[in-house]
């Protein structure tokens, strides 16, 4: 195994090791701040610039300096008015001094504030998700463009020359500059040839012949000076990037909010919803987000209520699917909207309702959705228990029947942030053409 030795010299009064630790500490502080913003903010706001504050004590890089509380100094700096050579100056104590004696006399430092760009925010957000680099680059692309014709240009690649427009410009220029035509020169040459065959005795005959020759010479020189195609005539096809045609998508977020879904489970679910939103934002210009939460009853709520309401109760998952179907029929017809759904749950469900959920997906929802993702959030200790995909709760087993029949259905278990990305590989990777809607 190769060993790398860093032989770089330390900068003045600083240590490279300290600098690296400082940068790591600052990055961890930024990650913590972004994580809190994602946790407390809206899903759609993740893909935007963020104002970030850091404590002022954390933005200074460590440096070596003398300790004023230790060591001996046997000299007096020039220019002071208090001390002279030979005076004994008591050292300051190592304690912090009296508690309130100096209140109001010290100077405090404000927090250091700066703006993180959209790309920097996404870098920090993606760090825990372990996304491949190419996927990160694709997600950062805010708009997808295609090339379209946009008139003509006087410069460009030879492969883009527009012959028709070039010849049109050439023809107009030759008319404007009165370039002699080939027919005109040939007619003049025929007339000269005819006169040359006649007897040359008369003076008028010789004068006429000389005039015609001079005229022919002028026309030929003018024709050579005015080229048939000049560089100013050339036109190239011009292309400009154009956003893809407007397309609309709706993203349904379904989540179980019963007592078994704690803060860790909700945080993982929110990361999953954020990542799906970023994928869809790259494909579609307009995205609506519908939040449906359920216990033993389901309802459409706003984002704040979806994640932070304290309501809890029993668990009947089919109520969320019925509510989603109602919203689709009322506001999002499948022939006008691309429908995506993401469901997060811990797998708990009332007895007998899991079969009802599978029936709703089979008969109603999967024919309307472009993609449906089910995420079951488990504890890391349960990963070994559910080693195979066949083992699991009744809801998991019921959804396995849907997964086997619909290629646009994807299900997975998540125990930590790094488990979130694989659920997107199948949907957004290159795959053969297939009909998603049956």
Curated annotation (Swiss-Prot):
Family: Belongs to the UPF0229 family.
Gly residues composition-biased segments: 93-105
Classification via HAMAP family: UPF0229
PANTHER family documented for this protein: UPF0229 PROTEIN YEAH
Organism from which the protein derives: Rhizobium meliloti (strain 1021)
Phylogenetic classification of the source organism: Bacteria, Pseudomonadati, Pseudomonadota, Alphaproteobacteria, Hyphomicrobiales
Ranges for region Disordered: 55-107
A Pfam match: DUF444
Domain of life: Bacteria
Protein name, UniProt field: UPF0229 protein R01398
């Amino acid at each position: 195994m190769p060993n790398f030795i860093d032989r770089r010299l330390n900068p003045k009064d600083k240590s490279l090791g300290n600098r690296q630790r400082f940068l790591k500490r600052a990055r961890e502080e930024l990650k913590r701040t972004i994580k809190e913003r994602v946790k407390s903010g809206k899903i759609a706001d993740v893909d935007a610039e963020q104002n970030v504050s850091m404590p002022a004590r954390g933005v200074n890089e460590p440096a070596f300096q003398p300790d004023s509380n230790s060591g001996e100094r046997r000299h007096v700096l020039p220019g002071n008015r208090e001390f002279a050579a030979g005076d004994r100056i008591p050292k300051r104590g190592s304690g912090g001094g009296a508690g309130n004696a100096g209140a109001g006399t010290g100077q405090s430092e404000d927090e250091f504030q700066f703006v993180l760009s959209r790309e920097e925010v996404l870098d920090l957000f993606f760090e825990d998700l372990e996304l491949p680099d190419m996927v990160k680059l694709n997600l950062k692309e805010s708009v997808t463009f295609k090339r379209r014709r946009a008139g003509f240009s006087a410069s460009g690649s030879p492969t883009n020359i527009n012959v028709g427009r070039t010849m049109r410009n050439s023809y107009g220029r030759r008319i404007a500059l009165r370039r002699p035509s080939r027919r005109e020169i040939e007619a003049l040459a025929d007339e000269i040839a005819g006169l040359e065959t006649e007897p040359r005795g008369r003076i008028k005959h010789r004068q006429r012949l000389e005039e015609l020759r001079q005229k022919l010479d002028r026309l030929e020189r003018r024709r050579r000076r005015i080229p048939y195609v000049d560089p100013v005539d050339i036109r190239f096809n011009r292309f400009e990037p154009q956003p893809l045609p407007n397309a609309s998508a709706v993203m349904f977020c379904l989540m179980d909010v019963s007592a078994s879904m704690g803060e860790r489970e909700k945080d993982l679910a929110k990361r999953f919803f954020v990542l799906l939103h970023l994928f869809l934002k790259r494909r579609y210009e307009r995205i609506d987000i519908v939040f449906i939460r359920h216990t033993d009853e389901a309802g459409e709520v706003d984002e704040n209520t979806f994640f932070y309401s304290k309501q809890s109760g029993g668990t009947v998952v089919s109520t969320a699917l019925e509510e989603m179907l109602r919203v689709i029929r009322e506001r999002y017809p499948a022939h006008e909207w691309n429908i995506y759904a993401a469901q997060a749950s811990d797998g708990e469900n009332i007895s007998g309702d899991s079969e009802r959920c599978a029936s709703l997906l089979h008969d109603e929802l999967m024919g309307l959705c472009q993609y449906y993702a089910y995420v079951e959030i488990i504890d890391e200790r349960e990963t070994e228990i559910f080693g195979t995909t066949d083992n699991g709760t009744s809801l998991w087993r019921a959804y396995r029947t849907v997964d086997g029949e619909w290629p646009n259905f994807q299900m997975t278990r998540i125990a930590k942030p790094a488990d979130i990305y694989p659920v997107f590989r199948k949907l957004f990777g290159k795959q053969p053409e297939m009909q998603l809607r049956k």
